[in-house]
């Protein structure tokens, strides 16, 4: 008779705790860090760890992270589907995949972007601090757990105000290292932006500095799941897994993204307070110079206050979702080839 | 006193969010004082209101120095205060993370830009600030180590402590940082309240500002000369964390001396009422920050102690 290992004990516990069915032996749900709440509740940051049956420890490792912002839900579906596909075909797994589905569980439960008690943006506290307050402590433990990965993908869904086309965002400091991965992520658009100091406190920036190449994906809108965008990203993730030697399945067809480095991004802001009504319907995408993106209307006097016109031939990859706007509100981002 | 609207954000159904400035004296831009940047900073707004009331009287008595101008901005976020939201309520954005601002961007960045255009160029910038965690500080002056900070000037407020800290990435988009990088000597004043009004520490803050303005030759005001401050670096403050969760009873107040091994807090089981943890001081020193909420979660910082300092 063999004694169970600690890992098996944790697995058994988590299966009971979360009512997971053990349909195969490839996955193991671990607690990365936990914090006791004042009244009989523990907040747990979980990860689902997958490795091939005869793992040697030398396999490539991908970390998939999401839920840093509690109002971003597409990543939830992405995690579900990536896990489902790995579980359905464990024989195709030849590397390690760690899925961190929710770094800010309290925010997600409440539909809040930040940590609810402090209204604190968790993506401004990385790399964290083991001696710091709760958010910094959690951030430090998450970073420690991810270190050692060959690649990390941090999945975001904009916020409740702006809708985004599937895109990969890179800080120009890391562009050389990350562009080869970004190009095969099945994104519509890869946006390389200039470095801003405040972004140094994000998970992606911190991990890139600590030697873990990390991509940020943005798509959809807060508090919603866009199935089509999710499926697009899932194909991109499996494509990357194949590239890293982690997955032996059939390579999905992926699109070649438009690169921001070949053109310029125009930001269109409101000149009036009012209601923004989009003229683009459900889908963003290609637009001609002079075409209408939408109107700012006044519901009080029945007037159009401003017609929003595309400044160039290009693609609309960001669009205001919440119609209530003030002067200065970002309405759209249009990428135009130079 | 001259009252003016520095910037206005047009509302959809609400009246415009007007940022009002109060100018005292004329001439050289001497000092600028900013109150509530966040909608829950009621103490900070209250301190500004008391300061404006006092400066009005001083001006009527000719106590503002010749060729010196003081600008006081009680709040930039009237919209947030009126709906009890900390951040700019339309897109839930922290205005104090939008500096130096941008007039071609969203309304919080426009507010930041308009405010910064109005408040830069002053010799001294003073902001009444708040901390994101629930807790009380010993009233103190805080400055970031940008290379332009001046602890000796901060000492002239006459508060007990001056705290310096290395800026984190998120600090680089605050008003204080932008002020310092643009030639203004910038100070943040922390009192021991945020979303409630604490009269005693508000009076202390008003006195500290008037003491500073007097010492810089900007106003003539006769008040107690205050303390010679101890200057401490934030990383020297020893954090004490709770290693469990429940009802929280703090046994020490900011300013209290503690000795190694003293019981400084108790955590009680929220259902059964038993004391489940007595938290002991890990060092001798003075309590600088103390958690205030009636409950505590695991790993929360409940105290910060100035080590090896005595009353």
Give each language-model segment a name.
Chain A
Residues 2-338:
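Structured catalytic-domain cores with a bias toward divalent-metal coordination
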């Amino acid at each position: 008779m063999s004694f169970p290992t600690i890992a098996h004990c944790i697995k058994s516990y988590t299966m009971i705790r979360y009512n997971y069915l053990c349909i195969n032996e490839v996955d193991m749900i671990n607690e990365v860090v936990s914090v006791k709440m004042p009244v009989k509740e523990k907040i747990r940051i979980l990860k689902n760890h997958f490795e091939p049956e005869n793992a040697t420890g030398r396999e490539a490792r991908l970390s998939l992270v999401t839920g840093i912002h509690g109002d971003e839900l597409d990543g939830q579906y992405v995690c579900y589907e990536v896990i489902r596909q790995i579980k359905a075909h464990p024989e195709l797994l030849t590397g390690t995949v760690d899925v961190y589905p929710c770094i800010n569980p309290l925010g997600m439960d409440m539909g809040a972007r930040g940590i609810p008690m402090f209204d604190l943006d968790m993506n401004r506290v990385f790399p964290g601090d083991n001696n710091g307050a709760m958010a910094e402590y959690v951030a430090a433990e998450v970073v420690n757990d991810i270190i050692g990965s060959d690649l990390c993908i941090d999945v975001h869904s904009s916020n409740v105000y702006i809708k985004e086309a599937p895109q990969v965002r890179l800080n120009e400091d890391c562009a050389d290292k990350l562009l080869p991965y970004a190009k095969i992520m099945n994104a519509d658009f890869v946006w390389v932006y200039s470095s801003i100091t405040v972004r140094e406190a994000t998970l992606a920036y911190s991990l890139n500095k600590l030697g873990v190449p990390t991509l940020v994906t943005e798509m959809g809108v807060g508090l919603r799941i866009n199935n089509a965008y999710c499926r697009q990203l899932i194909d991109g993730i499996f494509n990357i897994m194949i590239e890293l030697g982690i997955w032996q399945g059939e390579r999905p067809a992926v699109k070649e993204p438009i690169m921001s480095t070949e053109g310029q991004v125009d930001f269109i802001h409101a000149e009036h307070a009012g209601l923004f009504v989009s003229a683009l319907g459900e889908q963003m995408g290609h637009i001609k110079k002079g075409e209408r993106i939408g109107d700012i209307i006044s519901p009080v006097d029945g007037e159009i206050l401003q017609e929003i016109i595309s400044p160039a031939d290009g693609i609309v990859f960001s669009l205001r979702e919440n119609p209530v706007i003030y002067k200065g509100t970002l309405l759209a981002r249009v990428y135009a080839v130079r | 006193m001259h009252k003016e609207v520095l910037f206005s954000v047009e509302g959809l159904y609400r009246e415009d969010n007007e940022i009002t400035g109060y100018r005292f004296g004329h001439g050289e831009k001497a000092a600028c004082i900013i109150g509530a940047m966040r909608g829950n900073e009621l103490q900070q707004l209250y301190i500004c209101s008391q300061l404006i009331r006092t400066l009005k009287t001083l001006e009527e008595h000719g106590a503002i120095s010749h060729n010196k101008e003081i600008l006081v901005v009680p709040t930039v976020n009237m919209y947030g205060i009126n709906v009890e939201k900390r951040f700019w309520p339309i897109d839930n954005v922290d205005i104090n993370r939008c500096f130096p601002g941008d007039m071609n961007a969203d309304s919080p960045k426009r507010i930041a830009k308009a405010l910064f255009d109005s408040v830069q160029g002053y010799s001294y910038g003073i902001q009444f600030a708040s901390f994101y965690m629930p807790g009380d500080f010993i009233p103190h002056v805080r400055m970031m180590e940008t290379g332009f900070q001046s602890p000796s000037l901060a000492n002239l407020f006459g508060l007990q402590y001056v705290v310096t800290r290395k800026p984190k990435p998120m600090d680089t988009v605050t008003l204080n940082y932008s002020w310092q990088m643009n030639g203004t000597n910038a100070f943040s004043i922390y009192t021991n309240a945020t979303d409630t009004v604490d009269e005693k520490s508000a009076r202390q803050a008003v006195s500290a500002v008037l003491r500073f303005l007097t010492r810089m030759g900007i106003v003539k005001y006769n008040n107690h000369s205050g303390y010679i401050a101890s200057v401490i670096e934030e990383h020297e403050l020893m954090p004490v964390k709770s290693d469990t969760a429940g009802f929280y009873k703090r046994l020490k107040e900011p300013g209290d001396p503690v000795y190694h091994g003293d019981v400084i807090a108790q955590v009680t089981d929220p259902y059964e009422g038993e004391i489940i943890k007595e938290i002991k001081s890990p060092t001798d020193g003075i309590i600088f920050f103390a958690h205030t909420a009636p409950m505590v979660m695991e790993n929360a910082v409940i105290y910060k102690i100035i080590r090896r300092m005595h009353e």
